[in-house]
A protein has these predicted regions:
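Membrane-interface soluble catalytic domains
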Residues: 1-8, 22, 85-91, 96-97, ...
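Short, hydrophobic/glycine-enriched beta-strand segments
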Residues: 10-17
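Metal-dependent active-site segment of extracytoplasmic phospho-/sulfohydrolases and closely related
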Residues: 13, 35, 287-327
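A structural signal for short, well-ordered beta-strand segments and their strand-loop junctions
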Residues: 15, 47-49, 109-115, 232-236, ...
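Short, structured active-site-proximal loop/turn typified by the sulfatase FGly-forming signature C/S-X-P-X-R
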Residues: 24-69, 109-113
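Short secondary-structure boundary/capping segments
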Residues: 27-31, 126-130, 248-253, 322-332
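His/Asp/Glu-rich, glycine-adjacent segments
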Residues: 72-268, 272-275
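Short, hydrophobic/amphipathic alpha-helical packing segments
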Residues: 96, 214-222, 285-300
Length: 351
């Protein structure tokens, strides 16, 4: 009897940085994440641990940052073995050791988009596309059509804290070029409208800034993956991590002290004032998970029956109360009035 040979398996690895199980389980239980619910029901949930990690040690979080954990996940090396602790480092210790390097060396097609510490782009001949993280040293990537996206992402990362008006023309030019990388016109328009909408709608729209990168990256991923169909593909997204870091207190105020941190005191006179302000951000963690859930649903229709979809988070997070758990020194300007007067800016004050 002749048996039909089963097609080889492919893997699509969604790197959802730092997505916390606490919120995942909560939103699934509330019926808000049907795609994640399907994965939990029909697939497998695996929780790993870092050998030697002791969460009770002072500043234990310093040894489990994303730039440490993701390389361990990619390579199987312990943090001590690969020695990476932050972006900008020489990553030669993991070259040839990452899962995509190994597969590439054996002639199995791969595609990398945004994986942390994946710079520089490299191939032994089987990589179909390779776009490193947005914190890469430069926008090097391949194929050529992916470069427009990487130029915009690297530019955005390099100018994150700079006033938008100073680089608006260059930013808009780079953004428009991302069409070559698969960015949809609707996504480009949404990105261009962000700052004007903030002016109209106020602070409640500001959190979406953290989503824009994922919107663009996902468009490019769908295009590159759809064109090349590599046997192993990865895509890295950071929007959930940002929302958790920034808005956990807004999402679950009952888990935090009814007090003002040193930073809070710069902006609020009373706890009630802070709570009223943060209320407008209470659902952004949920929004970030729900957006990802919709993208997973898209993937289920995009992949074939021989493709395994994996969602990895590298590490979870926990809430730190800024009132007593975060040491964030506040630098105060002394004699500010005299300084601004000398600069001929008498109406200016430090908030």
């Amino acid at each position: 009897m002749i048996q039909q040979r089963q097609a080889p398996l492919s893997v699509l690895f969604v790197e959802l940085n730092e997505a916390e199980q606490h919120f995942l389980r909560r939103f699934v239980a509330e019926g808000k994440l049907p795609a994640f619910a399907r994965m939990l029901e029909e697939g497998a949930f695996v929780r790993t641990r870092i050998p030697g990690f002791d969460p009770t040690q002072p500043k234990a979080w310093r040894v489990i940052s994303p730039w440490i954990v993701w390389p361990s996940l990619y390579t199987g090396l312990t943090p001590a073995e690969h020695g990476l602790i932050g972006f900008g480092q020489d990553t030669s210790s993991i070259h040839g050791r990452c899962v995509w390097d190994v597969l590439d060396a054996h002639g199995i097609s791969v595609g990398v988009l945004g994986s942390l510490m994946s710079f520089p782009p490299r191939t032994s001949g089987a990589a179909r596309y390779y776009v490193p993280e947005s914190l890469a040293d430069d926008p090097s990537c391949f194929p050529d059509e992916a470069r427009a996206l990487q130029e915009f992402c690297v530019f955005g990362a390099r100018n994150y804290s700079v006033d938008f008006a100073r680089h608006a023309r260059e930013a808009l030019t780079l953004l428009w070029r991302t069409r070559k990388s698969g960015a949809r016109l609707s996504t480009i328009a949404r990105t261009m409208a962000q700052v004007p909408l903030e002016k109209l709608a106020g602070a409640a729209r500001v959190p979406e800034r953290a989503m824009l990168h994922s919107y663009l990256v996902w468009d490019a991923f769908r295009t590159l993956y759809g064109q090349h169909r590599p046997r192993y593909a990865s895509v890295h997204l950071n929007h959930v991590a940002y929302m958790q870091h920034r808005y956990w207190r807004a999402a679950e105020p009952q888990r935090f002290r009814d007090a003002l941190s040193a930073t809070d005191q710069r902006f609020f006179q009373a706890v009630d004032d802070r709570k009223r302000y943060e209320e407008r951000f209470h659902d952004w963690i949920e929004k970030s998970f729900r957006w990802m859930d919709a993208r997973l649903a898209e993937l289920f229709h995009l992949v074939d029956n021989n493709t395994v979809v994996i969602v990895g988070t590298a590490l979870g997070v926990r809430p730190f109360d800024p009132v007593h758990e975060i040491h964030n020194p506040v630098v105060r300007l002394v004699h500010e009035g005299e300084l601004f007067a000398a600069l001929q800016l008498p109406a200016h004050v430090v908030l």
